[in-house]
Structures are given as C-alpha cells and as structure tokens.
Curated annotation (Swiss-Prot):
InterPro entries: IF2/IF5, NA-bd_OB-fold, TIF2_bsu_arc, TRAM_dom, Transl_init_fac_IF2/IF5_dom, Transl_init_fac_IF2/IF5_N, Transl_init_fac_IF2/IF5_Zn-bd. This is Translation initiation factor 2 subunit beta. SMART domains: eIF2B_5 (SM00653). It comes from Picrophilus torridus (strain ATCC 700027 / DSM 9790 / JCM 10055 / NBRC 100828 / KAW 2/3). eIF-2 functions in the early steps of protein synthesis by forming a ternary complex with GTP and initiator tRNA. GO terms for molecular function: translation initiation factor activity.
C-alpha cells in the first residue's frame, strides 16, 4: 500500500492543532526590572510565576542558586541583593521554563512536578509523558530536533485513527504507517511540519 505522506501530514497536523494553542503560553512576561541602590527588583515576579504555574519559592531557590546571591519576596516583587541585568534574568527564567515547566516531549506548558521516591518527575497533562527532571545542559544536548531523510529508532506509543503508529521523539509527534503499538522500530523521516513528522519503517518489506 502506498501512502500519500503529504495528506497524512496534513491530517496529523490537524489532529494536533489544538495543542498549538499552548504556544502562546510558552512565553513568560518580560521581567519588569528596576534598580534601587545595589538591589535589583523584579516588579512582576508573581505574575511570571503564576504564568509558569510554579511555586514562587521554588523559582526563588533556583534564581538564588544560579546567581549565587540572596533574594527576598516582597508582595508581588522579588528583591535581589545585587544588580542583575534584565537579559540575565530573562535567560535564567527561560532556563527554568525549559527545565521545570515545558514538557520534554510535546513542549506543552501544562505540566506538574511529582516526587516519586527520591526522583522528581516532570509530568505532562497534555501528552502523559513522565520524565526525571533534567539539567539545562542535558536539555540543550537533546534538543537538536530531527531531519528529513535521517534514520531514528523510536518506540510506538499509540495508534492513530487510520491505524498508523504514533511515536514521540525530540519534541516531535511522529506518525509511522504499518508500525504497531509497543514496537521498537527504526524509521526514516519523510515529511516535517512544525512539531509533526511522517516517517516510514526503515526495514520495509
């Protein structure tokens, strides 16, 4: 059976289109920063943490560790005990999002952190993925994406409406005709559109 990869890609993109509505939530507000003496004040700190749906104290612990300085919450504002540039603050906020908020699989921000034993897991409410919290370096090293014509090994996690296998890899949802749920298969990417890809089995008979 010959598959029309373009049609399959369009259908798959349509199925996942509702998930793209989350993209507007991926960008946190820019820090509203002012300086008083030697202190840096983020005036909209609580607005930022509410957008991320994370405990402000957890974000404060992350920032104080990254900057190596103390900080205190005062109402809606975070007061940092030395001057820090807006670019530095924005960079650390983005790193926090990538590490503790954004799903490593589908890139949805609808996640929560759960502790299982001694391990903290990032659990996605959108796709159901569960992964141990990674370091920012690990995320960067594993975020190179996929390329058309390249071969990858994936696990088929579910089945689409037309019977095609569905895998998730490097933030992409990959549709694989003839693949069955539970199989570990080698695939070749044929089409990519945003975070959706169509592949074929590398060892087709």
């Amino acid at each position: 059976m010959n598959f029309d990869y373009n049609k399959l890609l369009e259908r798959a993109s349509g199925v996942l289109s509702s998930k793209t509505k989350n993209e507007s939530r991926l960008k946190i507000p820019e820090p509203d920063v002012i300086y008083e003496g030697k202190s840096t004040i983020i005036r909209n700190f609580i607005d930022i943490t509410e957008m991320m749906n994370r405990d402000p104290e957890d974000v404060i612990k992350y920032l104080t560790k990254e900057f190596g300085i103390g900080a205190v919450l005062s109402g809606q504002r975070l007061i940092i005990n030395r001057k820090v540039s807006e670019d530095e603050i924005q960079s650390k906020m983005n790193e926090y999002m990538a590490t503790y908020v954004i799903c490593y699989e589908c890139k949805s921000p609808d996640t929560e952190i759960q502790k299982i034993g001694r391990t903290y897991l990032l659990v996605c409410k959108a796709c159901g993925a569960q992964h141990p919290i990674r370091s920012n370096r690990e995320i960067i090293e594993n975020s190179n994406g996929i390329e058309i014509g390249k071969e990858y090994t994936v696990t088929i996690e579910s089945t689409g409406s037309a019977g095609e296998g569905i895998a998730r890899y490097q933030g992409y949802t990959i549709y694989v005709p003839k693949a069955k749920k539970g199989e570990r298969v080698k695939i070749i990417i044929r089409k990519i559109k945003r975070n959706v890809a169509i592949a074929e089995l590398a060892d087709k008979k």
